[in-house]
Amino acid sequence: MKTELKAVLKRPKISEKFDELREKKEGALIGYVMAGDPTFEASSEVVKALAKGGADIIELGFPFSDPVADGPTIQVAGQRALAEGMDIERYFAFARALEVDVPLVCMTYYNPVFRYGVEKFVENAAEAGISGLIIPDIPVEEAADLKTGCDAHGLDLIFLVAPTTTEARIRKILQRGSGFIYLVSRLGVTGARDDVAGSTKELLSRVNTDIPKAVGFGISTGEQAAEVRKAGADGVIVGSAFVRIIEEGTDVNERLETLARELKSGMLEAN
């Protein structure tokens, strides 16, 4: 057990990763996958493939039966993970055992966190080598207990900002959030789209902060990643495009690595 914990603690924090990338004038590729999809063993290889392809940070989804912010691709991924027997204890064991040296971010919903116990969830997440939490269905005004727990255990609490987010709420998010700010490039649920919304640049300009800004909800190609990087984003977040490859089930790891390289290359070319 002590050996496992030493390996976990070597993972960099989110802020350390962004500092490293900023020195190299690179944007962060943040890849999302559902833990346990399609199986526990295969999911571990999926995470390795993303890291090998150039993912700088990996969002590790924990499935929930009512995922209000997820599009159909990620909803089905959650169903597959639940069918495999994913639960919170197995999720933390899975995260702890991952052989990757990039920051891990847990993305889930508030219901399972609340039912498990906020303090216990945050403590166990930290022990599993997780660096941050994204819980899209909890408003910043109601996240005091979660923020306290995250601060106590050295985790970043990452909030979402959408085009409809008010200036007052953005100010609160910038006061209480850390790690990076998750900017929603389009309204609605997650999913790959044919183009990146024109409101992305305007949204970036509204969020005045030294906290890194990452744009998600609709990016699936290197060209789109370059567009977002040119608009001023510190990172791009890609989920559905990766999860769709997993769902298709053909040459999964090779295709994931290839797409990650394409996305990372797009951002590098935008410098």
UniProtKB/Swiss-Prot annotation:
GO terms for molecular function: tryptophan synthase activity. It catalyses: (1S,2R)-1-C-(indol-3-yl)glycerol 3-phosphate + L-serine = D-glyceraldehyde 3-phosphate + L-tryptophan + H2O. The active site is at residues 59, 70. It holds the Pfam family Trp_syntA. Its EC number is 4.2.1.20. CDD domains: Tryptophan_synthase_alpha. Keywords: Amino-acid biosynthesis, Aromatic amino acid biosynthesis, Lyase, Tryptophan biosynthesis. Pathway: Amino-acid biosynthesis; L-tryptophan biosynthesis; L-tryptophan from chorismate: step 5/5. The keyword Lyase applies. One of its GO terms (cellular component) is cytosol. InterPro entries: Aldolase_TIM (IPR013785), RibuloseP-bd_barrel (IPR011060), Trp_synthase_alpha_AS (IPR018204), Trp_synthase_suA (IPR002028). The alpha subunit is responsible for the aldol cleavage of indoleglycerol phosphate to indole and glyceraldehyde 3-phosphate. Belongs to the TrpA family. Tetramer of two alpha and two beta chains. This is Tryptophan synthase alpha chain. It comes from Methanosarcina mazei (strain ATCC BAA-159 / DSM 3647 / Goe1 / Go1 / JCM 11833 / OCM 88).
